[in-house]
C-alpha cells in the first residue's frame, strides 16, 4: 500500500520572538509610545485602552486585538475606567501575508483567549 503525503504551504513564518508579556496595569496607565522594526500585537484581556498607531486612535475593549506593523509609532493609555490587562507579543515576520492585519481591529473568542493564555504560560 502506497502512502501519499500532503504538502503543506507556509504562509506566515515567525523568525524571532522578541517579547511575550501579560501586563496588569493601573487605571491611569500611560505609555508614551515607541516604534521598532518588528511586528507587535496587543490584545485586551480586561478593561479598556486607547491606542494610537500612526495617526489613528482606537479604543480597545476586552477581546479586541490589533497589530502594529514594523516601524509604526504606537502608544497605549488606560481610559480611566477598569484597569486594563493586556497581552503583548512582538515578533519578526517578513511574510507579505502579515499585511492582511494592517489597520484591522480583530475580536478574539474564548478559544483564542485560551490559546493566548497557554502561550503566556509557556513563555514563563
Place the predicted regions along the sequence by residue.
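Ligand-binding loop in jelly-roll beta-barrel domains
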Residues: 71-99
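Alpha-helical structural motif
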Residues: 16, 82, 111-115
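Glycine-rich, phosphate-binding/catalytic loops in enzymes
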Residues: 60-61, 83-85, 105-106
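Short histidine-centered beta-strand/loop micro-motifs
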Residues: 29-36, 77-79, 104-105
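Short, intrinsically disordered, charge-balanced linker/junction segments flanking boundaries
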Residues: 44, 90-91, 119-124
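Residues at the C-termini of beta-strands that transition into short coil/loop
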Residues: 24, 90-92, 109
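Generic protein-terminus/edge-of-domain signal
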Residues: 1-59, 65, 72, 116
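Amphipathic alpha-helical segments enriched in hydrophobic/aromatic residues interleaved with Lys/Arg
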Residues: 98-124
